[in-house]
């Protein structure tokens, strides 16, 4: 045991602790210690290896690490292999940026093989960077052997799963509309589309009804570029549509518009007048044919029979008619399938019109908007700009388009019911994350597009015959090699693309060019990390995962993809319990971004406050499933708590070292936990209380941790440090450590604070692993386990919990607070004693507390006497005040008379009579008035010098009247405080004695300080001598003090000089 620095230096402590962990291989030793324990299988949701971690990533890993440390302290054999998502657009786009590429053509020119190698190196190097960053946050996981989605054995897990889908009839290839990034030239998932506001054209277009002159259907759209692919107009079958004769500049037109929208549409078109000629329902309008206004410019449009159809998604806004292009919209596509419409998509993968786009061929679709608007000519009824939310590619930020393409799909609807039942069978934290949010999302899930038209990813293991179109799915590389007679080792592109397989028809099978959606990659994590399917031993032993946790966006991402893939492969959920956490936002609740200038990095926080403060702040700020609104003031508050913890830990060390204290130990030299149990009944009440408190806290913390309520856990522990330990126990026990002689009381104090600190280290270890390791290292005995993280979790010893004691102490603490409030009202500092404190109560529990803890209550209140009065206090007077809003309705014109009677009456007597009988009768001599409590209120009228405050079930009154004796003690306490501050300024050791010299010119103060008070001052500050002078001139001029200071003590100037005693 050694003394420690007076200030908390987190970065020094954390660097030292992490060095210790590395040199002593503590993580591996903890894992080995638990090797025979029950297995607890955790799967790490893999982050993309794209760069430095951000605050949200840090929160994610800190949350995981805290839970894993907690589980290890329960003796569980925790499977904690880190994971990394190393394929996909996140990596490709970064590499493209490094190489200066703009599109796929640049990649093809560079060479797919060379590009793949650059992606691989990028992913590997950033994996290493991120691992080191996670380690610097104190995160313990298996970073030496993480699962990586680029490894052949991992890739095989995806291949095997797809083969299961194919064999179970869940794999399908079809021509469907998908989200499409024209820059990346690939399909992207719904969850990968990011939305923000953009300006687009908002246009009203007239579609001429076939065979009729000047008669039109009016539609509205924000995507003019999709008009070349129009095949139908949708209406609601129940809406009423009006056939309107509209007049503009003397010309008449017949327009069909939803009846309720006629006026705003015509206003938009600047028509001067109109009349409704007839009406039809949407159902009656269905079947009407019309011509495309662009038919002369797009030959294919002349071949299409354009028809009005009914649809359930049409809303009563704009015109009430929806332009339908099944090749460019999901709802449009589904409607097209239902109604047998053409799925016309004249747009290529880069977003340019193909030859089928007629006059627009070769133009980028969004660039063609203005040309299309111009070509519409008189068919453009009106136009304006609209700001609306529009989707963008999650990686390159390009506005997406919707495009019908050939893709591979998993038929989710076929297994949806099983997925929903598995959601119900899973434990969710919070419950609504699964039972509502995730359940609702899966209920609406459609076929999962698993194919991507890119390069760096897991190649889809489907080989298709060019002759007969038969396909074959390979589940392993070995299976492929056997069929192809090849020796493939790296199943990435372009190597796998070179493998051909003979078809039974005599033709040749070649691999389809697509790669997997990266969400399909990570969906395999729970079995791929166990080596399945190459090795199934660990899988059968451990799967499914006991626990996973990720952000709330993963209900659409990893939670979903895992459940889908696992239902395909094993017909059950891959996880037993799931904790969903929130997003890391700025203080105003905005997403952090460089453009807003509101990004806070984990490194910034660590540089200022250290890792443990960051961890404790993140965990305590809010419930895990709520968004974290990062606030520097909150971090500072947590930092103050950590400093207080350090000071509490530091406080007893000098005394223990001076006294040669060593805590109780067992015969084999280890700390003896049972000593406290054996000695508990002999200990002072305050020691028993803090021991009971920390065990009560331990039980609460354990229950909350089992429900993943980490915010409640960390707040409980911080409150214990601040309120129970620092502001209560340490303040009360401090004088016992100053005792010169050895005594049972001092030993109990040492044993108690050692027990509390060691227990607190264990309770805090999962959340603040560095400071607790440093504290434990200094407190542990030589034969104890070398690390706090090798200790057993303290679940709370019921043998050491005294609920009655805690209740009684709670009364005294509330009394202490009430006294402080009353003193503040009376402007009497706590260091100044008072003669009497009165407690007025009717509560038996309050009376019992003061009966058993009177000495402690007196000491805390700094009072010579406490008087507990049951019922009412005779010196308390009350003034009665009439309540006119009640008196008026009750007594009418007599209200002023009643008011006067109440004001003239004895308020205390009125209050007493109301308490006893519920009513009181007052008379003006001619008439009596019966009043109840609603007719008056009462205000206290305290005697002079007495100030009051309320506490639970009691009122507290402090008599601040000063006597000379009280004044003498008050000044003595003030001088003691100044001398202690001066000792601290000289950095004296606890055992150092000093000589004191005081100049007090005030005659009254000198007369107050009798010998007994001077002895008290010397005793409290280890003063060997204390000389008092009436002026500076009275001092011995030859004596120089190490520290000499002038102090203003309650308006009296006092000069104090101290030196180390010889």
Swiss-Prot record:
A Pfam family of this chain: DUF5915
Catalysis: reaction(s): tRNA(Ile) + L-isoleucine + ATP = L-isoleucyl-tRNA(Ile) + AMP + diphosphate
Residues making up the signal peptide according to the UniProt record: none
Cofactor(s) listed in the protein's UniProt record: Zn(2+)
Location within or outside the cell: Cytoplasm
Entry keywords, A to Z: Aminoacyl-tRNA synthetase, ATP-binding, Cytoplasm, Ligase, Metal-binding, Nucleotide-binding, Protein biosynthesis, Zinc
Function in brief: Catalyzes the attachment of isoleucine to tRNA(Ile). As IleRS can inadvertently accommodate and process structurally similar amino acids such as valine, to avoid such errors it has two additional distinct tRNA(Ile)-dependent editing activities. One activity is designated as 'pretransfer' editing and involves the hydrolysis of activated Val-AMP. The other activity is designated 'posttransfer' editing and involves deacylation of mischarged Val-tRNA(Ile).
Subunit structure: Monomer.
Domain notes: IleRS has two distinct active sites: one for aminoacylation and one for editing. The misactivated valine is translocated from the active site to the editing site, which sterically excludes the correctly activated isoleucine. The single editing site contains two valyl binding pockets, one specific for each substrate (Val-AMP or Val-tRNA(Ile)).
Family: Belongs to the class-I aminoacyl-tRNA synthetase family. IleS type 2 subfamily.
Protein name (Swiss-Prot/TrEMBL): Isoleucine--tRNA ligase
Name of encoding gene: ileS
